[in-house]
Amino acid sequence: MIPEGKNHGLIFVLDWSGSMSSVMLDTMKQLFNLIWFCRKVSIPFDVFAFTNEYNYMTWDENDKPVYPEPHYEKKDATLVVNDHFSMMNILTSNFNNRVLEKQMKSLHRIAFGFTKYVEYSVPNRMGLSGTPLNEALISLHNIIPAFKKQYSLEKVQCIVLTDGEAAPCNRHSEVTYPNGEVHLGTQR
C-alpha cells in the first residue's frame, strides 16, 4: 500500500459526442464529484474530452480553410485516425482553485446548454461530434506514460465516462489500380 495515495493518479476521459447531449449534465456532475475527491486527497488528475469537432476546421487571416495536420504516418494496415480527432485537456490538477472553479463552471454551463438544446451557448468548436472512442483509447498509450512521468506516479487509473459504443474504426489499405499505380485507401 502506498501511504496517503500520493503515488496514484487518475485520468478521466469524457465522451464529447452527440449521443451524450441528454446525459452530459449528469455525467459532468459525477465528474466534478470525482475531481473534488482527487483535490481533497491530493491525487493528481487530468480530464480529457474526445471529439471530432474541436479540430474540425479553422480559417486563416484571409478566411481560407486550414486543414489539420495528420496525427500519424498513414501506411498500409494501420488504423485510420480521423484528421479532426482531438483529445481536449479540459481540466487538470495543475489549476489553482480559482481557475479550476472557473473552468468547472464553464463546463457546467456548456453541459446545461446541451441538455436544453440551446446550441448558441456552446463556444465555437466545442459542439458535440461523433464518437471517436477507439481513437481516444489509442491516444492514451501516449498520454498515460507522460502523465505518469510528470507526477512520478506508480499507479495511474483511467476512467472513461461514455454512454456506449464507438464509431467504427477503419484501416488503411493499399490498392493497386489496373494501370499498376498503388494508392492508399481505407477499408472496414
Q: Predicted regions span which residues?
A:
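Acidic, glycine-rich A-domain
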Residues: M1-R188
